[in-house]
Amino acid sequence: MENRALDPGTRDSYGATSHLPNKGALAKVKNNFKDLMSKLTEGQYVLCRWTDGLYYLGKIKRVSSSKQSCLVTFEDNSKYWVLWKDIQHAGVPGEEPKCNICLGKTSGPLNEILICGKCGLGYHQQCHIPIAGSADQPLLTPWFCRRCIFALAVRKGGALKKGAIARTLQAVKMVLSYQPEELEWDSPHRTNQQQCYCYCGGPGEWYLRMLQCYRCRQWFHEACTQCLNEPMMFGDRFYLFFCSVCNQGPEYIERLPLRWVDVVHLALYNLGVQSKKKYFDFEEILAFVNHHWELLQLGKLTSTPVTDRGPHLLNALNSYKSRFLCGKEIKKKKCIFRLRIRVPPNPPGKLLPDKGLLPNENSASSELRKRGKSKPGLLPHEFQQQKRRVYRRKRSKFLLEDAIPSSDFTSAWSTNHHLASIFDFTLDEIQSLKSASSGQTFFSDVDSTDAASTSGSASTSLSYDSRWTVGSRKRKLAAKAYMPLRAKRWAAELDGRCPSDSSAEGASVPERPDEGIDSHTFESISEDDSSLSHLKSSITNYFGAAGRLACGEKYQVLARRVTPEGKVQYLVEWEGTTPY
């Protein structure tokens, strides 16, 4: 992956004031928008900007003023409504030159009407964005307008990087043709109401081939960027990217490391986008990964032999039940898999730098601004050292948490919160557990792992007279439920005299009073002590079946019996798993 220098003057705003689009020009665009687009007529051939950043030839079938869009038929006979802002039409031959922005026909010093050498439309030098013919950007012959520069330079896999058109595109990308603060975004900052993205201002789909700038959070088409060495995969967001506006120069990009679970997730997502199927055979998944091995840019995983890739992928599919669904779970073939939720994988936020660590515009190092290809070592020394320390700390923490991940969310009620903290899943990527606790917070045993895929269920004997046994998982008491020291001493003295019933599986209550105490332990203790009364009720409700019921864990009653002493007991099958 090619890394361009991350400019020391990276800012929170979109460029300096002198580089912002001319607000007067933008106002003229809005005022004359309908008059300009009234030239679009049925049967006219136009270029339409699509969600991938590319332009496609089409023929207008219908014009809608209310929708400010046209129904366009493309070369493959497909029909779509396209917004006026995304339609590029040609000028009329022989027509008197006039500005396509302000519709004016007069020219002045340093404000002449320039005719685009491709579309034939005219633009005042001051109306064009950026201003045409400035001191640092002389006019080319022939001259091309902003839209035609994009139409000439954008490519699938990345825009042109060499030549006059590529240099002009880089200059054009330094200024946006819209006001980003006016865009109305959704809460995850993935879509906006205006359907305005990238440098080109066209439509886009964040879950396809788009990069999100880490600073301004705008999305940019793969086809409009000039920093990629390899084409992108659908939904691949494992990049640290800064746009040209934020970096005040060429784009900066860095590939983030992927784990095997991310590789197979990305492969399943791409297979689903391309074939519209839900389930895929493991051999099909493996073949896809091997075929796109170079495009995945896996870093340290790249050296993995072909023979070792299959076991790693299969282990990830079987281990991470929170992401993948096996056909065996729905009584189909066990060698087919699909995504539980059809969304691309999230890059781990712990590997991204803190925005506060990035240099600002007022720093002394802003004088060292780089405009061309540079190595990361050319950044200011102090910033580089600080960046390395933070990156190493975050990466080591991420790898440690990945080595001891949470238990499978299908068998543990605490997984939603734990998975979100480790893997940075968003809410639309985690299926909420129907049996989640409503008010209390519990912690699973440290031995549970996300790779645990046990299918057995725990069976426990539930006694009708409140003789609760300790649950299959160790749990910590809430702060208010910890035993007072005096109660622990009394419980230890009475422990040898207190009988305890065994469960249907033959598991007895532990002798340590911290882990479980039979309810009859307190019969000889005065109930006048309010703390002991509260302790008795809290422990009874926390440990064993009562605690599992309070957590909302699902269960099924398998049998009922009456003991010779007249006690009614039930054999209960719990949904969760047990290590014992």
Swiss-Prot record:
<keyword id="KW-0597">Phosphoprotein</keyword>
<dbReference type="InterPro" id="IPR042017">
    <property type="entry name" value="PHF19_PHD2"/>
</dbReference>
<dbReference type="InterPro" id="IPR013083">
    <property type="entry name" value="Znf_RING/FYVE/PHD"/>
</dbReference>
<keyword id="KW-0678">Repressor</keyword>
<feature type="domain" description="Tudor">
    <location>
        <begin position="40"/>
        <end position="93"/>
    </location>
</feature>
<dbReference type="GO" id="GO:0008270">
    <property type="term" value="F:zinc ion binding"/>
</dbReference>
<dbReference type="InterPro" id="IPR025894">
    <property type="entry name" value="Mtf2_C_dom"/>
</dbReference>
<dbReference type="InterPro" id="IPR011011">
    <property type="entry name" value="Znf_FYVE_PHD"/>
</dbReference>
<keyword id="KW-0677">Repeat</keyword>
<protein>
    <recommendedName>
        <fullName>PHD finger protein 19</fullName>
    </recommendedName>
</protein>
<feature type="zinc finger region" description="PHD-type 2">
    <location>
        <begin position="195"/>
        <end position="249"/>
    </location>
</feature>
<dbReference type="InterPro" id="IPR019786">
    <property type="entry name" value="Zinc_finger_PHD-type_CS"/>
</dbReference>
<feature type="modified residue" description="Phosphoserine">
    <location>
        <position position="365"/>
    </location>
</feature>
<feature type="region of interest" description="Important for PRC2 dimer stability">
    <location>
        <begin position="531"/>
        <end position="544"/>
    </location>
</feature>
<dbReference type="GO" id="GO:0140003">
    <property type="term" value="F:histone H3K36me3 reader activity"/>
</dbReference>
<feature type="modified residue" description="Phosphoserine">
    <location>
        <position position="187"/>
    </location>
</feature>
<dbReference type="InterPro" id="IPR002999">
    <property type="entry name" value="Tudor"/>
</dbReference>
<dbReference type="InterPro" id="IPR001965">
    <property type="entry name" value="Znf_PHD"/>
</dbReference>
<keyword id="KW-0804">Transcription</keyword>
<feature type="region of interest" description="Interaction with SUZ12">
    <location>
        <begin position="531"/>
        <end position="580"/>
    </location>
</feature>
<feature type="region of interest" description="Histone H3K36me3 binding">
    <location>
        <begin position="74"/>
        <end position="80"/>
    </location>
</feature>
<dbReference type="GO" id="GO:0005654">
    <property type="term" value="C:nucleoplasm"/>
</dbReference>
<dbReference type="GO" id="GO:0035064">
    <property type="term" value="F:methylated histone binding"/>
</dbReference>
<keyword id="KW-0156">Chromatin regulator</keyword>
<feature type="compositionally biased region" description="Basic and acidic residues">
    <location>
        <begin position="511"/>
        <end position="521"/>
    </location>
</feature>
<comment type="similarity">
    <text>Belongs to the Polycomblike family.</text>
</comment>
<dbReference type="GO" id="GO:0140002">
    <property type="term" value="F:histone H3K4me3 reader activity"/>
</dbReference>
<dbReference type="InterPro" id="IPR047400">
    <property type="entry name" value="Tudor_PHF19"/>
</dbReference>
<dbReference type="GO" id="GO:0019827">
    <property type="term" value="P:stem cell population maintenance"/>
</dbReference>
<dbReference type="GO" id="GO:0045814">
    <property type="term" value="P:negative regulation of gene expression, epigenetic"/>
</dbReference>
<dbReference type="Pfam" id="PF14061">
    <property type="entry name" value="Mtf2_C"/>
</dbReference>
<feature type="compositionally biased region" description="Low complexity">
    <location>
        <begin position="351"/>
        <end position="360"/>
    </location>
</feature>
<keyword id="KW-0539">Nucleus</keyword>
<feature type="site" description="Histone H3K36me3 binding">
    <location>
        <position position="47"/>
    </location>
</feature>
<comment type="function">
    <text>Polycomb group (PcG) protein that specifically binds histone H3 trimethylated at 'Lys-36' (H3K36me3) and recruits the PRC2 complex, thus enhancing PRC2 H3K27me3 methylation activity. Probably involved in the transition from an active state to a repressed state in embryonic stem cells: acts by binding to H3K36me3, a mark for transcriptional activation, and recruiting H3K36me3 histone demethylases RIOX1 or KDM2B, leading to demethylation of H3K36 and recruitment of the PRC2 complex that mediates H3K27me3 methylation, followed by de novo silencing.</text>
</comment>
<dbReference type="GO" id="GO:0005634">
    <property type="term" value="C:nucleus"/>
</dbReference>
<feature type="zinc finger region" description="PHD-type 1">
    <location>
        <begin position="96"/>
        <end position="151"/>
    </location>
</feature>
<dbReference type="Pfam" id="PF18104">
    <property type="entry name" value="Tudor_2"/>
</dbReference>
<comment type="subunit">
    <text>Associates with the PRC2 complex, which consists of the core components EED, EZH1 or EZH2, SUZ12, and RBBP4, and various combinations of accessory subunits including AEBP2, JARID2, PHF19, MTF2 and EPOP. Forms a dimeric PRC2.1 (class 1, PRC-PCL) complex consisting of at least SUZ12, RBBP4, and PHF19 or MTF2; PHF19 and MTF2 stabilize the dimeric structure which enhances PRC2 interaction with chromatin. Interacts with SUZ12; competes with AEBP2 for SUZ12 binding. Interacts with EZH2 (via its Tudor domain). Isoform 1 interacts with SUZ12; isoform 2 does not interact with SUZ12.</text>
</comment>
<keyword id="KW-0862">Zinc</keyword>
<keyword id="KW-0805">Transcription regulation</keyword>
<feature type="region of interest" description="Disordered">
    <location>
        <begin position="347"/>
        <end position="390"/>
    </location>
</feature>
